[in-house]
Amino acid sequence: MSDKQINLVIVTGMSGAGKTVAIQSFEDLGYFTVDNMPPALVPKFLELLERTNETQKVALVVDMRSRRFFKEINSILDHIELNANLKLRILFLDATDSELVSRYKETRRSHPLAADGRVLDGIRRERELLVPLKSMSQHVVNTTDLTPRQLRKVISDQFSSESDQASFRIEVMSFGFKYGLPLDADLVFDVRFLPNPYYQVALREQTGLDQAVFDYVMTHQESEAFYNHLLDLIVPILPAYQKEGKSVLTIAIGCTGGQHRSVAFAHRLAQDLTADWPLHESHRDINRRKETVNRS
């Protein structure tokens, strides 16, 4: 059995109050997540996690979709409280009756407790049954006036710690426009206006990771000026992206073929940012031209 404590968050609350967004937010924070776990399986699941010692952060959605929820939840909570290796917190999501009715009408889904099909009756019944659990919850969040992004921000603020800063990371990548834009890019910068090393015979087969190409790209006055503007733009906005709860920010820099100019710029940017942020550097098309030539 593990000697490390497992941080367990049970996500529950009113149906339609935002539990799907919540569990996705916990996943972005590095939690192992399970949606709609039958309450009876929770103790066995936690015992397995303790034995394997694979994760110390777990978030489970347990709600009215589990039909025996109210018969089993109290005994499960008692079991967890007796286990010294488990630190339990309950997140209860709520919203006004009118907002929940509006959300159900929008999605055209039926309420799990609306036996006669009347959503409002199901909401009222569920709210009554959840009173004891709500009173036990350490975190109660009313999502009536929250957008999904705002709810993610609330969860990040309440459940992330300083050690979770690595849950926000930066991906710096180079690419070639001739092969298409990266579909997952958040910020895209075009350096095709810079002098192209491709037209220097001695540099053509090298890449922006080679010192000769890097120096050729960066020694031009317009390159240095643009890079300084780029850095001045990116550095101040990174904390804002992190604050908004974004888990990965992908910065893509493109040139024509993705072999020279964009590689040099992406590499320099990664070098300058990596001291302050978790970062991964990649060059999508750096070998694309060579592969194409070899196939022809």
Swiss-Prot record:
InterPro entries: P-loop_NTPase, RapZ-like, RapZ-like_N, RapZ_C. The keyword Transmembrane does not apply. ATP binds at G13, M14, S15, G16, A17, G18, K19, T20. One of its GO terms (molecular function) is ATP binding. GTP binds at D63, M64, R65, S66. Gene3D superfamilies: P-loop containing nucleotide triphosphate hydrolases. The keyword Transferase does not apply. Transmembrane segments: none annotated. Keywords: ATP-binding, GTP-binding, Nucleotide-binding. NCBIfam families: PRK05416.1 (NF003828). HAMAP family: RapZ_like. Displays ATPase and GTPase activities. Belongs to the RapZ-like family. This is Nucleotide-binding protein SZO_12220. It comes from Streptococcus equi subsp. zooepidemicus (strain H70).
